[in-house]
Curated annotation (Swiss-Prot):
Extent of the signal sequence: none
Keyword Iron assigned: yes
This protein's name: Magnetosome protein MamH
Gene: mamH
Highest rank taxon of the organism: Bacteria
PROSITE patterns the record matches: MFS
Function: Required for correct biomineralization of the magnetosome; probably transports some form of iron. Partially functionally redundant with MamZ.
Family: Belongs to the major facilitator superfamily.
One GO process term, biological-process aspect: iron ion transport
InterPro entries per the UniProt record, alphabetical: MFS, MFS_dom, MFS_trans_sf, Tet-R_TetA/multi-R_MdtG-like
Residue ranges of the TM segments: 18-38, 54-74, 83-103, 104-124, 149-169, 175-195, 240-260, 271-291, 299-321, 326-348, 355-375, 377-397
Note: This bacteria makes up to 60 cubo-octahedral magnetosomes of about 45 nm in diameter which contain membrane-bound crystals of magnetite (Fe(3)O(4)). Expression of just the minimal mamAB gene cluster (MGMSRv2__2365 to MGMSRv2__2381), including this gene, is sufficient to form a minimal magnetosome chain with small magnetite particles.
Species per Swiss-Prot/TrEMBL record: Magnetospirillum gryphiswaldense (strain DSM 6361 / JCM 21280 / NBRC 15271 / MSR-1)
Amino acid sequence: MEPGRSEVEGHQRNALYLLSALCMVFMTLVVAIQPLFLRNVLNIPFETAGAVNANVQVVTEVLDLFIFAYLGYLSDRIGRVRIIVAGFLVAAVGAVIAPLSPWVGGASIGALVVYYVSRVIMSAGSGAVWPQLSALAGDFSDDSNRARLLSNTAFMMAFGVTLVYAVLMQIPGHAGITVTMLLTAAISVAGAWLARKFLVDVAPRTVETSVPWRAVWDLVKAEPRLRLAFASSLFARSDMVFVGLFLMLWFIYFADLVKVGQAEAAARAGMLIGLMGAVVMLSIPVWRSFIERFGRIQAVLLGMMLSALGFIMLGFVVNPFDGFIVFPILLVSAGQAGCFVAPQILTVDHAPKDLLGSVLGAFNVIGCLGIIFFVQIGGFLFDYIGPPAPFIFTGVGNLIISAYALRLVKSEARGVGGGNTPGDDEVA
């Protein structure tokens, strides 16, 4: 018999936290090193940089659409742990192929195709891992400790992002791009071993024989807070990709104008994004207290407003090497911490235990759609309008969700907004 939530041991929770960090190190390092690899190894020119980088991201996200939906359901059927282990191993295969793409593919077009394939493989692997880690955190929690456990998981994910940009993105300047890319394979293998050794499944198995789209749709249709959570996923998940991809692109391709080396530019961008990760990480405990005191919806509202303000302010930055850029980045960071935690807690609150994987799978599918839309449009805006344009675009999206969250807060204040969420205070 599988252990219940009360029987989950401390070392199993700690393993979940560590794996959350390792998974984000892998995913973030892959995205962060991509512009540097395409520019300096595959020699992709500035004129097409935005489109090429965005297309790579979109291809992987299209794959994730199918992975999230099916594997979320499959995890409800067979458990999360074996999917996590397999995902790490698949990701390791893609991570080995990626730096070898110039030699495997030969000519520049062939090398780019091989790199696309390697990114698809890595995305398939990581797409099998991190949603199941989030679901497992939900499995381990109950109403009394959910905000704490999911916040701790989010804290470790933010720590992984911070580690990449503050430390690991300094490696290309010393050991080279290839060594840095191969590091991702080692991280994946370590993750597979840790998951197999220490994680445990605790959720009840579903009796559904196919992906329960109808059941998920009925849940979302009936619960306004789930609608807000899903809408937040559409916009908020793309925000972190925006910062990781387009800010790095901006620094690397602006470097020639200010006579700064490419590796140095990548390191400067990495330190800035590392600062963002540090702010996200350090503010998550504050958001946890805010959520427990004021509620999930209020956290989404405030987080989206802060992010929107920061993104729009980035539109007024001309030179990314200017110190002014730090202020909007700090606003985005603080906002994203709230947007990262609160919608997931809302989703876990309202998902049946035997369908949690499926509901989170649908939640993540919506996030993929947001990334595909915003990154694709962002790449076009980067190339044809300018580097700040993608940030303004996504800032407007954040404002739209802020307006929806505010409307829901007001409707609940009038007593017509849906049932109470565990841990939420009543809005007087």
